[in-house]
């Protein structure tokens, strides 16, 4: 160990430098040889660490600021900086551009040694190279790419080197002789000389390739576990389960045969293993046959097969024994059972049918024509039309209905159905009663009133040539009720029978006064501007005004002449009795008796007057009408 190396180690311990700073100090030492490539490669790798990067760059800037006698510190620091720009982190170039002034000052570096040799020229040339690399970004990018490729190539070439190369990297801290310690052994001297890179670029490339390959090996995903072991375990578990099942079956059957004892032949064992498969196949066949039979029952559109039964059910899934034995005439869409037709008597059907299905004489299509039911007392059906013959009047309870006549024949045998949209028939009510019903001002009719929930109370008019029915008039149902055989019809009393012969001489006063019919509107919300309002709540002002004579004779005040109080101005208005009466309009002598003084004496009250003044209406003088500004106010 040289004296400079020993002194450097002591300084490292005294100043407590970190590992990165120690490496930079060793690479930029004052020794007469250049920095080794392996050491610079380690420093370049440290620049990718944030903490180590700050320590490395701090020591480099300190070395660049040394004095002239330590020109090797400056030169080696520039050499290390050039190497870091090409192979280190990109932050090195960024920080060098920030401290570009520090590098530019080294262009004028001067130092002449004792022999008179200018040693500063080496520093000035190195500064020019570094400055050119920093200013040209494209060149810096190319240099970095080329250095990376060289490092990878050298790493691939160095993969065949044995473990003897490891001694090349092992060294004692701060000892420059440690880099050649591996060559001291004559055993590995020849191999190391052949594998050792000739240039620093090759050495750096080998190191980078080695690091990349080790990193790739570490990041390689773990290969998936083989499924062979899992398959073997699954087969073993299945075999054990099968054996346990066989043992359970044998113990349940109590079989002591050689089969149960484990001496079963191989052929019987195969047959026994195939039995579950056969059972499964049989179950599948049974399921298919059951499904096919269900589909046959569900085929309701196919013609029914010939069966000995004479009845056929309307149910598509009926019992096959109830199908007809002969093919029905006509197409398959021929007469069929109506689901809404009356149910026949119970003895006509077989008791084997659980839902009392309707018997028909044709195929079982539920959407076909209605067949003729067998004779017999029909069962009450809430959906079937009524059978007794009666004539419904035109003024029934249904305001939208029409007169319909039903017959006692079969409800399904040709009777016309009830049509709610048919044209209503003419009313049989006498014309005189209809005219009198229209003449009634109250809107009440002796027999019928239009059923309109949104209409007014005016009497109904004829529509479509007949009177509209009244919903609550039950008198029209009297004709539909059957007559009892033991009772005679009670005669209906009429005005002629009640009043006698004098009824013909009476005059109907209601028919003489006819109220004007208001415009009928079917829409209660159609109240536009064109429709006049039926009543005006503010129409009090339209009444006739009283004449002057009526006002004079109708409201005398305290015995005054009809013309009003003496001295009252023409057109003045007298005050109401509910308000204080002004003294200027009524004389004192006219309002109070003469015996009553105006001011009562002390301790006594004036007796009330015999009569209070009557309320006076507004009067107008005989000289002319009211002024134009006095309008008619309906609230006065």
UniProtKB/Swiss-Prot annotation:
Q: Where in the cell is it found?
A: Cytoplasm, Cell cortex; Cytoplasm, Perinuclear region; Cytoplasmic vesicle, Clathrin-coated vesicle
Ranges: sequence repeats? 315-317, 338-340, 365-367, 381-383, 398-400, 523-525, 536-538, 633-635
Q: What induces it?
A: In keratinocytes, by wounding or contact with collagen.
Q: Which GO terms describe its cellular component?
A: cell cortex; clathrin-coated pit; clathrin-coated vesicle; cytoplasmic side of plasma membrane; nucleoplasm; perinuclear region of cytoplasm
By its UniProt entry, which SUPFAM superfamilies does this protein fall under?
ENTH/VHS domain
Compositional bias segments (type: Low complexity): 174-189
Specify which residues bind a 1,2-diacyl-sn-glycero-3-phospho-(1D-myo-inositol-4,5-bisphosphate) according to the UniProt entry for this protein.
8, 11, 25, 30, 63, 73
Domain UIM residues, every copy = 202-221, 229-248
In which family does this protein belong, per the annotation?
Answer: Belongs to the epsin family.
Pfam families given for it? Answer: ENTH, UIM
- Spans traversing the lipid bilayer: none
Q: What is this protein called?
A: Epsin-3
Compositionally biased residues, Basic and acidic residues: 214-231, 242-256, 270-288, 426-435
Coiled coil regions in record:
none
Q: Please list the residue ranges annotated as the ENTH domain.
A: 12-144
PROSITE patterns reported in the protein's UniProt record: ENTH, UIM
Residue stretches of biased makeup (Pro residues): 607-616
- Keywords associated with the record: Cytoplasm, Cytoplasmic vesicle, Lipid-binding, Phosphoprotein, Repeat
- Source organism per UniProt: Mus musculus (Mouse)
Where is region (3 X 3 AA repeats of N-P-F) located? 523-635
GO molecular function, one example? EH domain binding
Main location as per UniProt: cytoplasm
Q: Where in this protein does the record say Phosphoserine is found?
A: 184-185, 257
Superkingdom of the organism of origin: Eukaryota
Chain spans, region 5 X 3 AA repeats of [DE]-P-W = 315-400
Q: Where is this region: Disordered?
A: 153-503, 607-636
């Amino acid at each position: 160990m040289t004296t400079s190396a020993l002194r450097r180690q002591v300084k490292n311990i005294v100043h407590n430098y970190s590992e990165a700073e120690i490496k930079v100090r060793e690479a930029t030492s004052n020794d007469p040889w250049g920095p080794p490539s392996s050491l610079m490669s380690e420093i370049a790798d440290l620049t990718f660490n944030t903490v180590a990067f700050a320590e490395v760059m701090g020591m480099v800037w300190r070395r660049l600021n040394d004095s002239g006698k330590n020109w090797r510190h400056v030169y080696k620091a520039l050499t290390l900086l050039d190497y870091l720009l090409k192979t280190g982190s990109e932050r090195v170039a960024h920080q060098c551009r920030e401290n570009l002034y520090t590098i530019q000052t080294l262009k004028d570096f001067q130092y002449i040694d004792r022999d008179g040799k200018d040693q500063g020229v080496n520093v000035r040339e190195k500064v020019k190279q570094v400055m050119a690399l920093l200013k040209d970004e494209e060149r810096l990018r190319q240099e970095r790419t080329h250095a990376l490729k060289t490092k990878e190539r050298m790493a691939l070439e160095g993969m065949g080197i044995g473990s003897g190369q490891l001694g090349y990297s092992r060294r004692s801290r701060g000892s420059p002789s440690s880099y050649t310690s591996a060559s001291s052994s004559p055993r590995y001297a020849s191999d190391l000389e052949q594998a050792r890179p000739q240039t620093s670029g090759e050495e750096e490339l080998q190191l980078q390739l080695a690091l990349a390959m080790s990193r790739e090996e570490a990041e390689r995903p773990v290969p998936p576990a083989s499924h062979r072991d899992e398959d073997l375990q699954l087969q073993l578990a299945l075999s054990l389960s099968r054996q346990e099942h066989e043992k359970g079956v044998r113990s349940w059957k109590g079989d002591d045969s050689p089969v149960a004892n484990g001496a079963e032949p191989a052929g019987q064992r195969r047959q026994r293993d195939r039995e579950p498969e056969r059972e499964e196949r049989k179950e599948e066949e049974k399921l298919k046959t059951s499904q096919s039979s269900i589909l046959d029952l569900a085929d309701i559109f196919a013609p029914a097969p010939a069966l000995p039964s004479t009845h056929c059910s309307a149910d598509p899934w009926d019992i096959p024994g109830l199908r007809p034995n002969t093919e029905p005439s006509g197409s398959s869409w021929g007469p069929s059972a109506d689901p809404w037709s009356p149910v026949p008597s119970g003895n006509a059907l077989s008791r084997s049918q659980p839902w009392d299905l309707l018997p028909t004489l044709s195929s079982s299509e539920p959407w076909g024509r209605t067949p003729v039911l067998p004779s017999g007392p029909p069962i009450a059906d809430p959906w079937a039309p009524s059978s007794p013959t009666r004539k419904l009047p035109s003024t029934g309870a249904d305001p939208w209905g029409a007169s319909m006549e039903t017959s006692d024949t079969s409800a399904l045998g040709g009777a016309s159905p009830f049509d709610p949209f048919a044209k209503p028939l003419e009313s049989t009510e006498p014309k005189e009663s209809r005219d009198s019903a229209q003449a009634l001002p109250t809107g009440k009719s002796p027999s019928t009133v239009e059923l309109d929930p949104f209409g007014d109370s005016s009497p109904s008019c004829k529509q479509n040539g007949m009177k509209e029915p009244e919903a609550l008039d039950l008198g029209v149902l009297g004709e539909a009720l059957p007559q009892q055989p033991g009772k005679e019809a009670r005669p209906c009393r009429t005005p002629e029978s009640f009043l006698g012969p004098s009824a013909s001489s009476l005059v109907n006063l209601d028919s003489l006064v006819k109220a004007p019919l208001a415009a009928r509107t079917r829409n209660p919300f159609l109240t536009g501007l064109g429709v006049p309002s039926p009543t005006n709540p503010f129409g009090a002002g339209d009444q006739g005004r009283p004449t002057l004579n009526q006002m004079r004779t109708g409201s005398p005040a305290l015995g005054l002449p009809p013309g009003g109080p003496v001295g009252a101005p023409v057109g003045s208005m007298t005050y109401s009795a509910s308000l204080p009466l002004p003294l200027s309009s009524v004389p004192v002598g006219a309002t109070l008796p003469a015996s009553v003084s105006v001011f009562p004496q002390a301790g006594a009250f004036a007796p009330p007057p015999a009569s209070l003044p009557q309320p006076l209406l507004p009067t107008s003088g005989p000289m002319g009408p009211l002024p134009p500004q006095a309008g008619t106010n309906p609230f006065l």
